Each structure stands twice: as structure tokens, then as C-alpha cells.
Amino acid sequence: MKSLDSNLDKALGRLSGGLYVVTASQGEGSTFRQSAMVASWVSQASFSPPGITVAVAKVRAIESYMQVGEGFVVNILREDNYQKMFRHFLKRFAPGADRFADVDVVNNIANGGPVLSDSLAFLDCKVSSRLETPDHWIIYGIVENGSVSDLSCKTAVHHRKVANHY
């Protein structure tokens, strides 16, 4: 892989994005499992049907949940209250650990995964297609449902300084 020169690295790092927690669930009963990750590479990709893209690193556990036909939820974090969720879902979890322990979720409103009570909004999506890049999958999802909890709040924004890490 070609290394980035300093100016290019800094220029790419200036691409900003919102802060999100992507969640997904699979299975039922004894096979039920859930996963989550912090994301900032999320973008609206189509109007009709409404669709979004999410970049997911190939090494993320949640990537295996996000296959064509499967559901996921994008929880949009609030500018005034994102730190707790951001820190919680950035930490490493032991295999099999409950990523949602000590996190308030709203049950039975999204098919794709948990909706975080503290999120500004959520988008319930179904994977329509996937595009492979060298180190990420670009997941295109059709938005099937969504809601905003507080119209007066703004989305938390992530500003990077360089492009070689999140």
C-alpha cells in the first residue's frame, strides 16, 4: 500500500462526518446475538428509495451481520450528549460480552438492531448491496423506518486531523 504524503494525509483528514453507533441483531432464542460499532463514515446515498452508505472495516465484528438482506440500525448521536455512547462503544469488548450492558435501549421499534435511548435519531435499514474496498466494506442500506427524538438538537460531528486513522 502506498503511504500518504503529509499534505495528502492532512487534506483527507479534513473530511468530516457525523458520529453514529451502528447496531445489528441476528438470530432468535439461543442463537440471538447483537453487535455495535462507532461510525463516522455514513452518508445518504439515494432519495428513492431512501438509502444510506456505511463504511465498515473488514476487521469489525459487526461486518458479518451486515450481509445482503440483513438489517441494521444507524443511531445518530446528539451534539450535546454523545460522549458517553461514543466512549462506551469505542472500547474493546471480550468475545461474547454484552455490548449493550449498562446502555438504555428502546425495544421493539426497529427490526435491524437496538435503538439507543440517548440517540438523536435512528434509521432502521436493510442491506441492499455491498462494495468491497481494500480495508472496508461499503454497505448500502435501504432505510425502512426512522425517527428523530428532538428536532432542536444537532448531530454530533467528528473532525479528524489526518487520514490514516479514525
What are these model-predicted stretches?
Residues 1-166:
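Basic, polyanion-binding surface patches
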